[in-house]
Amino acid sequence: YDIVITSTEFMATYANSGEFINFNDIDPDFKLDSGICGYQDTSYWNYETRSFDAKNGEFIGIPVNGNVQVLYYRRDLYEEKGLQPPKTWDDLIKNAAEFHNPPRMYGMIQRSERGAVTYNFGPYMFSYGGAVYKDPQNGDFSIVFNSENNRKALEKYLEIRDKVGHPNAHSIGQGEMIQYLRTGKAA
């Protein structure tokens, strides 16, 4: 293919395999506008360090899908109870508990089906200082997923599921989450 659209999480795989070419080989004067969000440098690949690197990498793609995580909540319900949007995971548990009345309503719907759980767990992991790789910016792709920070993040993820989530979170994907929100069964 001459042009593909892919999500940022697949960029490293394609870039490292040599499936992308440097845009500047086609147009040496092309520069990505500074107003375009770079999603952690995913437009630039450094073949030497095998990492994203806007400073020393080759320009391989225009970022259009950063898979930004968003916490949805029902503003009408929050206003009715005088709640503020949560700033911490514990705030989220406290707020969600106000609405949790299964099966009529769930305080939190987590997408935890196979595949979707990787998207949902990311914000927990990063908020606890966790990571998958040790130092990818400097080419160290040692796996550090089994770290203390990631363990704490997983414990919080499971705490939210167990206290205010759906008992079958493992079967909920994007479509199911949307239906819970649209039908008023999620706060």
For each predicted feature, which ranges?
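Aromatic-glycine-rich donor-binding/catalytic loop that engages nucleotide-sugar donors
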Residues: 75-86, 163
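Glycine-centered hinge/linker elements that transmit conformational signals in sensory
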Residues: 96-98, 138-171
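Extracytoplasmic/periplasmic substrate-binding proteins
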Residues: 4, 11-13, 119-123, 155-187
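Extracytoplasmic/periplasmic solute-binding protein
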Residues: 47-64, 69, 93-142
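Extracytoplasmic/secreted proteins, especially bacterial periplasmic and envelope-associated proteins
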Residues: 9, 73-76, 87, 91-94, ...
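Short, solvent-exposed loop/beta-turn-alpha elements that line the ligand-binding surface or hinge
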Residues: 24-38, 112, 130-152
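Hinge/lid segment of periplasmic solute-binding proteins
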Residues: 8-68, 84, 93, 120
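Sec-exported extracytoplasmic/periplasmic mature domains
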Residues: 15-19, 83, 97-104, 130, ...
